[in-house]
Amino acid sequence: MPSAKKRDSPSVDRRDRLTLAKLASYDDIATDALVDRAYFWTNTRKNRTKYNPMRGIVDDDVARVLLHDVIVAKDLAKAERELLAMSGLKKFMARLPNNREKDWFRRHLRKYIQMYLPDSPFEITTTNRYTITEYEAAVCARKFIKQGQEIKYLSGTLVPMTREEERDLDLKRKDFSIVMSSRKKTPSFFLGPARFANHDCNANGKLVTRGSEGMQVVATRDIYIGEEITVSYGDDYFGIDNCECLCLTCERLVRNGWAPHVPSEPQSKASTPALNDDTLSTDSHVSSKKRKFAPDSDIETSAPSTPCKRGKFVRQSSKLKSEVSFLEVATSIEQPAGPSPVCNGSDMGALGNSTVESDNDKAVDPALPSPPADSPPSTAANESERSSTSTTATSVCDAAVKIKVEETIEQSAEKVSALSEANVELPTTSLRSGSTEGDTKLELSDQPSTLKQGSIGSNRKERRKSRGKPLVVESVEAERQLVRVPGDYTKTSKLLAQTYDRWVDCHTCNAWFVQHDSYLTRRECPRCERHSMLYGYRWPKTDKEGPSDDEERVMDHRTVHRFLYPEEEALISRKDRGVSFGVTPTPELSEPRTETEGSEGCEDRRTTRASRRRTRSLRMTM
């Protein structure tokens, strides 16, 4: 009878299965060695956040193996042995615990080696359509692909995911290639060369499973040379109905993420109920998860109706000058010198109520002493604004009154807890008109203050510090969204960081690219230049096209002149460094003019007036 220890231990297949962590590490090593180190102009996104590039792998060595063993000799086994003999990959293979994991890594590495064969119809490139300032990997076709044809070597490896791995991915908030199996109804992790295929609402390819661990891309329509190979990620992958999608199809149709941003109309205060703290916190949490360029969201329509926004509006539009008569104020001030009268209970209650109401609207500490010159109008003036009649008791109160106010605002409860318990004597009362021109200040100082000068100064500093932090405004005003315009990622000044950076037109594929430190203009874009360095031909040619093809393959890329000749350089205009707003890279979109409507109208008027003057002069001479 078997022992309990053997019975409780998992099976060998379950213990040694290909997991998500293992496949992610294999893919990071393979992309680092065969994509980033193969004359690639940028680094691809890795699955592990703390991945460090391997040492012992040189770009020239990788390109030499790919050219001689893969492209010319078409010997994948020899190329695999040469690559695994490099010090970086050799050390990684030595760290693998058993032969089964070594076989998994070799099998996954072979998928990246195969995509450099001459009959491969695609290659890896980059695009900045989604983020403008950052380039992401994409798949571009370099051969014509018929509809229904399986795209050769554009494949990947599938790994089923567990509940723990799903939760781990949610916590890390990383964008992984996760596909849903239609038969098993379980999510699977998908990595390989096909993971670089981006989403498109009208995709020209689809993902098809091959066996238990394989995935292949099949063309759903004809794909032409230079066209990006895309697949569909799902209906609600980028929001509800893909409302945040930035694919090429949505760009051409100017919809979803490319739709013009229409600001919502401000709603009336009476029809919109006030939002409580729970609703406001929930909306702010939801908006933080949204992308910045999301179109019409709920947080935008509800933000202008919060009570904090109304409080700020009342404080800015105080009309003290129109409510308070300066004559009445002057007669009330001109009184014989003597002990100042004390406000009665009703007046004190009115003053306290007005103070509490204004504090709820403005979030200002009521227990602090008189505000400085840059403070807003007094709370008594706000009370006089609400009531049509202004009395002496509510607008001007004596300074020797001890007022004790209990703080009810949650935001400033911690700062004012020590001050709200003590009785503070107001030293002065200043009345200031709401107009900005010729402000009149009326001060009443009857009794000296009982507080020390140091405490008053510290209280004023605390008040200024609390007023200097616009906490309420941050919770009300939503973050400004990035409105995308079709073609805003091409020939834009956002990518020209240095003085000599400029946009250059490729002489091979006629695509615009950014050349850094363009003292001499390059002839080709990074994709076409990398292709010629690896294959020895101009893009998209990879091999001899027949027996009559006499073009020789360049085996040493250093013998090719990569810049324009002086006579060609003289024809290049360096004005504005190639920046042109509104120019789109797709021929389907009409190129809008760079002038505004007003300037076009002015040009028409200038032409019309000039033609009239010329006609009048001709009539006079005839």
From Swiss-Prot:
Stretch forming the signal peptide: none
Keyword Transferase on entry: yes
Cited Pfam families: SET (PF00856)
Alphabetical UniProt keywords: Chromatin regulator, Chromosome, Methyltransferase, Nucleus, S-adenosyl-L-methionine, Transferase
Subcellular location(s) per record: Nucleus; Chromosome
Catalytic activity: L-lysyl(20)-[histone H4] + 3 S-adenosyl-L-methionine = N(6),N(6),N(6)-trimethyl-L-lysyl(20)-[histone H4] + 3 S-adenosyl-L-homocysteine + 3 H(+)
InterPro entries per record: Hist-Lys_N-MTase_N, Set9_fungi, SET_dom, SET_dom_sf, Suv4-20/Set9
Example GO BP: methylation
Bias (Low complexity) ranges: 376-394
GO MF, one annotated term: histone H4K20 methyltransferase activity
Enzyme class (EC, first level): transferase
Ranges annotated as biased composition (Polar residues): 265-285, 427-437, 446-458
Residues covered by region (Disordered): 262-314, 335-394, 427-470, 576-622
GO CC terms in record: chromosome; nucleus
Assigned protein family: Belongs to the class V-like SAM-binding methyltransferase superfamily. Histone-lysine methyltransferase family. Suvar4-20 subfamily.
Record-given protein name: Histone-lysine N-methyltransferase set9
